[in-house]
């Protein structure tokens, strides 16, 4: 997406 959000080992 436009921004990168990282949660634990998952980046979206």
Curated annotation (Swiss-Prot):
Cellular compartment(s): Secreted
Keyword Secreted among record annotations: yes
Any one GO molecular function term: hormone activity
UniProt keyword annotations, A-Z: Disulfide bond, Hormone, Secreted
Matching Pfam families: Urotensin_II
Top-rank lineage group of the source organism: Eukaryota
GO biological process, one term: blood vessel diameter maintenance
GO cellular component: extracellular region
Disulfide bridges in this chain: 6-11
Protein family: Belongs to the urotensin-2 family.
Functional description taken from the UniProt entry: Urotensin is found in the teleost caudal neurosecretory system. It has a suggested role in osmoregulation and as a corticotropin-releasing factor.
The protein's name in its UniProt record: Urotensin-2B
Lineage: Eukaryota, Metazoa, Chordata, Craniata, Vertebrata
């Amino acid at each position: 997406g436009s921004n990168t959000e990282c949660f634990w080992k998952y980046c979206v």
